[in-house]
């Protein structure tokens, strides 16, 4: 008789979320740092692909232990629509934010001399409006032509798309099981979203991915502008609340518009009369 594998401890799950989130932030922000201060020549597609592959690698790293949420918006949506245990929510979110913070701090440490050299060459005073160009290495800020409301809408829409497709890719009842391919497909989706909508808001889609690095830049000398983005309404609120709303809309929309119409969803209801007739 085979025995079921033990469920990972909550500590182990949180550690996996910490490491997975840290890995994706390390690759993503490291790529942008290379572009901004080290003279690398990446285009939008290359940057988006690096972020996407970073997410895929992070999922492969952590999925077996924690489910690889790596995103508070995803955790909240899964709690509301997919049975994730609510008691784990604050621990997962804390681990995700901490992982993003530590990875951003590590990238900053590794590139610190290049940041200082770039600031001196460009006469940039850290904490000024001009310094947002370097703060954006670590977290997201909207295109200057966008209002805060427009940026909020962009983040809601792209996170809803992300969450709906995540639900589809991890739903074995929806077509062929994706299995080991799902992380790669999720990474490709992020790359496509980044290429299409990245210039508008930086495609945050993840409160931890944005808030953790923003906190790091605040402490590293950028000060309040790291959170406000130079806007009257502090911009840091947008990449927190818009992705949460978007993820919930995406997960709920998938359940209502797709999952309920799948053949597998109708099968149990159709099988029940068959049992009655056989009895």
Curated annotation (Swiss-Prot):
The keyword Repeat applies. Keywords: Cell inner membrane, Cell membrane, Membrane, Repeat, Transmembrane, Transmembrane helix, Transport. GO terms for molecular function: glycerol channel activity. The chain crosses the membrane at residues 9-37, 43-63, 88-111, 147-172, 181-197, 235-257. It is a multi-pass membrane protein. Mediates glycerol diffusion across the cytoplasmic membrane via a pore-type mechanism. This is Glycerol uptake facilitator protein. It comes from Pseudomonas aeruginosa (strain ATCC 15692 / DSM 22644 / CIP 104116 / JCM 14847 / LMG 12228 / 1C / PRS 101 / PAO1).
